[in-house]
Amino acid sequence: LFPPLFRGCSAPPAAHTALPAPPPPPPTPPAVTVSPGGTIDPQSSTAATQGVVSTVASEAPALSAIPSSALRKYSFTFRQLGALDPLQLRGVDPISGIPFSIPNDEVVTAVKLKLDIAYSPSLITNLSHLKVLINGELAATIPLPKEQAGASVIKEVSIDPRLITDFNRMNLQFIGHYTLECEDPFHSSLWLNISNLSSIEFTVTPLAVQNDLALLPAPFFDRRDGRRLELPFFLPPTASNGMLEAAGIVSSWFGALASYRGAWFPATSGTLPNDDTIVFATNEERPAGVTIPPISGPSLAIGAHPGDSRYKILYVMGRDVKELRTAATALSLGRSTFSGPSATISKLDDLKVRAPYDAPNWIASNRPVKFGELASVEDLNVRGYSPDLVRVNLRLPPDLFGWKSDGIPLHLSYRYSPRPRPDKSTLNINVNRNYITSYPLLAFPRTDAGADAMARFVNKLLPDKLIPAVEDFYLPINQIPARSQLQFHFNFDYPKEGACKDVLLDNVRAAIDQESTVDLSSFPHYIQMPNLSAFANAGYPFTRMADLSETAVIIPDTPGVADISTYLSLMGRMGESTGLPVYGLTVGKAADVQRVGDKDLLLLGGTSNQPLLSQWAGNMPFSASGQIRTFSLSDWILKRMPWYEEPRDDKKPVAKLSAVSLNRDAVLFGFESPLKSGRSVVAIISDKTVGMADVLNALMDSDLVSKIHGSLAIIRGKEVESMTLGNTYYVGSLPPLIALRWFLSGTPWLIAALLLVAAAILGTVMYAFLRRKANKRITGK
């Protein structure tokens, strides 16, 4: 997944896709006090001689060049940069852009652009061409010879590296003409397509970074780098639960920073990875293969990699696991207070007590939320006759209960350039490309000929004056997944003036007002579980509390490297979902499960090292013995009454199915906790290292995530098979009236029985009343 792009793009809406927004600014951290001098060891010379930190003069540069022998090459396709569809350029002067960035610790020495294009055979060669602009500067002009028209052709262009900065925008501008006479600016023969498999290749020289904590999160993470983050964690081979909790806090912080890029945290021990690495150590738990200085408290330090000066090591240390957790929390919440090569945290204020559903990345569900909180002013404005989409990214709690509701109320305020006359211009509204509704873009009100003439005159005098409009409508909640994008397309009809009179004017503007709101406050939180879609897309139910204070991760008794890597990467995924480090998380093993029985549980391991798989086999929709996999099946025929209300998936399992597979696989499944009603367990099980990696890749692949749903998913490489198995249950609460309606909707026989009883009572009462009245008439009393 990639961030929103194509600002000012002239491609039609089919060329745009739903993309999540970059992460919001980090939450305001609690006060972190760094001891004077910011050193780990009072004897700084000792630390320096042991290769952990080295004192750098304050006037030393933050970056310095590494010898040219360290040159590296890498490339991105346009798809990797966010163009999930080909770029389609239409008209005489359309333009489409793609942003890209260069990490701060690299200098670009060469750039090669490889374009896969196709263009109209009707173009006049001498007048038509494709311009490549980097940050507004002309970088190249590509001719469009007639003999190559009408078919895909590869064009390679070298770009001057001096045009490249940290944050860049590459615009591709099509200049097209089909006649030497008067031409229609939007003639159907004016087209050029650019494949999203086109690529841009960089040759870079790495730069050595100064040992300074003030540069964090660089060089371990650079927001300019659009690649997936891969950051090794170096731990003792038998890391304690407390050390793993500290490591989880740090990985969730980096996961939140990585956002749409995704993050993978391979755990290692024994040999220090030849890469930027995070090292965790206490006085009792010191990883072999790296020198750790004496530790005087919760500490952070950054130093050169002992085996390769191109890389850095970040040391997170404490005398015990409590201090280690303090250091990890301070790193994730108070990094702006650090400077120099090392620091000791002398005080960390109490952390804010979190409330359910208060994740920074999630839309507030207790009040209307303004669009200005979700998108910048620039993102809400467009220009031109074929403007880009206005995109507003939404992250909703996945447990919103919208049964029988009108939908999510949306108050939309927008503005647009007045139309010179009534036409077919419209505002089309989609969610994740799914059509919702449309509204006409009207001209000024016209009551008579005089008013019409005056309106035309005002339009000519004030071409930039925008017409305000307000609409209130509902978004169908069943079409709004946890990760969604509102897409507003201003479709302006180009006015035709006649032969040789059409002139393309760039005076059309439109904007969505920042005061527009989306309101979730009317929806209770209530959801049927298990629901792996909620877990895969939003980390639910664990992310209900953004700090994971009601979550425990149960790792194997003897966890392997794959288990720890999976745990760390999952915590990165949780941080990406909420935007907050998981500083409330608990890590335990099978023997600790009773102590954390009142929490939601994330279960990791395999059939050989996770005893809870056999202990809880009767509660799970999945059990394993060797290569035999057993699944509980629900009776799907009886899940609903087709003539009444909506489907309900709360039937008991009626059968079991056994299957034998020798292929590599991983199983992701959920069930209600055997320890406490209403609590959930999500298990990720695989007997092979590659199986755990497949699960993580699936969770970070937008195409595969959409295939994860139900209560069980089997993942084999790039294949995902999901099914609904076992018992279902509900978490959350409903208002009394809605709860009664929901209960009765699942028991139509009870409604029939109540109607019969009511009819019998009413019949009895009426019989008694009429009998008494008849007796009075007979007796004359």
What is each residue range found by the language model?
Residues L1-G8:
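Sec-dependent N-terminal signal peptides of Gram-negative exported proteins
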Residues C9-K781:
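Solvent-exposed alpha-helical segments and adjacent loops
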